[in-house]
Amino acid sequence: MKNLQRPSGMPAHKYTPYHQNFPFDMSDRTWPDKVATTAPRWCAVDLRDGNQALIDPMDSERKLRMFQLLVGMGYKEIEVGFPSASQTDFDFVRTLVEGGHIPEDVSIQVLTQSREHLIERTYEAIDGAPNAIVHLYNSTSTLQRRVVFHQDMDGIVDIALTGARLCRKYEEQLSGTAVTYEYSPESYTGTELEFAARICNEVAETFEIGNGRKMIVNLPATVEMATPNVYADSIEWMGRHLYQREDIILSLHPHNDRGTGVAAAELGYLAGADRIEGCLFGNGERTGNVDLVTLGLNLLTQGVDPQIDFSDIEEIRRTVEYCNQLPVPERSPYGGDLVFTAFSGSHQDAIKKGFEAMERDAEQQGVGVDELEWAVPYLPIDPKDVGRSYEAVIRVNSQSGKGGVAYLLKSEYGIDLPRRAQIEFSGVVQKFTETSGSEVSAQQLWTIFRDEYLPSRDGSGSTWGHYRITSISTHAEDQANTVLEIGLDVGGEHKERTAQGTGPIDALINLFNREGMDVRLLDYTEHTLSASANAQAASYVELAVGDRVLWGAGMDSNTTRASLKAVISAVNRAVRDAQEAAQD
């Protein structure tokens, strides 16, 4: 097949490929052969990097709520602000410290630039915290060296080392706070690797790491500039060129400018990183920081404990939306409204069969479904594991098929339609959705089913139906024959009839045939709607009425009445369709 695409006219000449600006050789890379088997150290930066990107930054109440959420989920390193940059951030850090909100096993992280008055203010903010990470940064990229700082490499290194020395100076003034240092060569992805390694090594030397004293070297994709494999290559390269690697916690801070922040973080972790910074649901500057929810639950789907509790994703999402005043997109992995929802008919059918297979396997093995390996098509994770119900898994619109319709009726109302009845009813539903142009809820689905198969005369639904049972009595004439005495409302006229057959259903069909109809039983099935002693029975019959084949359904606390109602349901549908055809 010939490719018919044509040049777009987009100004590609304005942009230089990343490898031309920052060439390096990693032909001996090892990360592609590695697999993640444990969770990284996590650092949530929602209260700093995430907060600074909000249209309306969080007030103190929302900040505290976010902090409490992160602590409750299990994050042990939480960046809480840039206390030297604003009074609001400073006051919040002091609220955390003085209010006793910081657990002993949680380290708060604060950001600072390499200026003495800013560093001094930073240490004033954290004084008294049990554990603190002082995060020093300065930009190292070729672009910012040229257009922002007008500095050469030596000048940029001097900025970083001056900041490191000042941090050590003010650390001496703290009372009871254990400090860990973090250094970020900001805009790392726009920095030559040799220079990034040089400045990180010199900062590490200034911080005097070793002998039990570790530091964090954070390598931010401040702007995502290349494919994730290139970022991973750079992380493995840096790991080989940091002099005291055993005393360094190598950290990632991916942004999502190219839409591959999660992939960059996952590959960078395989490439030797120890730690990942990000935000819940990917909040952050421009296109956001890497999404900690996606990263954590991706690990869970591979059988790796993320060491973060995502078991109530709805509450996590509600809190994040409240604090950020931004909605979580409906398609956001794991947390969005629609991520466990199937509209496609083939998807719905596969999901339904997957659930049924899990239930069968559990019964055969004598264990609970939760003890089995999760294996349901189109659902990479059990929604229940993150606190979601199965109610929203299948939703019905014009693209839906029998599987989705059948699943909702069974899961919500206990109606277990036979396969051919599923096919017939899905056609009824599709006609409705194509006319309405909208999605059908489970409650609407029940209404459509009731009005099609269970016409009511109590005002709760449609009132059509040529035949309606008013009374039933059966007795066995002999072992082979049953006598049915039935009262029928026929088009508004009451009639009493008696018929015989091998059973009640056969007797009623014989009655219709005796009165000039052509009715034959093709299939019959029944089940109870619940396990309680007073449960109703649901019966389904497939009848040939003349040249039509239709299903009927009946429900009653008495199984005989339910089966006869199902016959009446199918005959009524045949009569209705014949009358509508005659009118056309």
UniProtKB/Swiss-Prot annotation:
Keywords: Amino-acid biosynthesis, Branched-chain amino acid biosynthesis, Cytoplasm, Leucine biosynthesis, Magnesium, Metal-binding, Transferase
Ranges for domain Pyruvate carboxyltransferase: 40-314
Domain of life: Bacteria
Any one GO biological process: L-leucine biosynthetic process
EC numbers, comma separated: 2.3.3.13
Molecular function terms, GO-annotated: 2-isopropylmalate synthase activity; acetyl-CoA C-acetyltransferase activity; magnesium ion binding
Region annotated Regulatory domain, chain positions: 456-584
Catalysed reaction equations from the record: 3-methyl-2-oxobutanoate + acetyl-CoA + H2O = (2S)-2-isopropylmalate + CoA + H(+)
Class in the EC hierarchy, top level: transferase
Residues making up the signal peptide according to the UniProt record: none
A matching Pfam family: LeuA_dimer
Annotated localization: Cytoplasm
Record pathway: Amino-acid biosynthesis; L-leucine biosynthesis; L-leucine from 3-methyl-2-oxobutanoate: step 1/4
Listed cofactors: Mg(2+)
Record's GO cellular component terms: cytoplasm
Entry binding sites for Mg(2+): D49, H253, H255, N289
Subunit structure and binding partners: Homodimer.
Function: Catalyzes the condensation of the acetyl group of acetyl-CoA with 3-methyl-2-oxobutanoate (2-ketoisovalerate) to form 3-carboxy-3-hydroxy-4-methylpentanoate (2-isopropylmalate).
Cross-referenced HAMAP family: LeuA_type2 (MF_00572)
Family in the record: Belongs to the alpha-IPM synthase/homocitrate synthase family. LeuA type 2 subfamily.
Name of the protein: 2-isopropylmalate synthase
Biological source species: Kocuria rhizophila (strain ATCC 9341 / DSM 348 / NBRC 103217 / DC2201)
Recorded name of the encoding gene: leuA
